[in-house]
Amino acid sequence: MFGINEDIPFVAINIAVMTVSDTRTEADDRSGDTLAERISAAGHTVFDRAIVKDDQASIVARLREWIAHPEIDAVISTGGTGVTGRDITPEAFHEVYEKEVTGFGELFRMLSYDKIGTSTIQSRATGGVAGGTY
């Protein structure tokens, strides 16, 4: 059976949202805004939010900071997963992962296909776990 198992009680979690971009600011971070709105609408808490430059060391530093925070349960990022030279978000996240959730990227691309067609092939979406944070 597909979908959400209604027999399992809902547990709200604290989520940090990272936008990876050299050009976005708080005033025009539409992707980050959308993530934050959907997280809140789903009943979770946006615990922290940051715009991080397309620089692997900066991404890793912020990610490690959030993973070390005892109240942050998950990190969701947007940006930097394409195939251009500046797209290094997956490499930064892989540097930090203790375990990769290998099926996440496949599921993400499958769901994205319905919206953007074959352009989904350009996404290198990834998921993993580090320090008990997803």
Predicted feature residues:
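Non-catalytic beta/alpha edge segments that cap or flank active sites
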Residues: M1-Y134
